[in-house]
């Protein structure tokens, strides 16, 4: 198991009352005390909570993927 500390995140979903896909960069903190920086995609429920899905997040389209990567690149962290 690992906990994820979010350092940066972007979404291209503007409706706050709908599910939103996020691209995040942060640090994975493992139970044994090790840490690693990395990227992940994750969904948020309409109420804002993260959906933990055993390491998998469905990316609906290539357009979503490219938009999220472009947004993160524009912010300078990808």
Residue ranges and their predicted role:
Residues 1-20:
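Negatively charged, low-complexity tracts enriched in Asp/Glu with abundant Ser/Thr
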Residues 3, 35, 42-43, 76-78:
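Short, Lys/Arg-enriched charge-dense amphipathic segments
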Residues 20-56:
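A short, structured beta-strand/loop element
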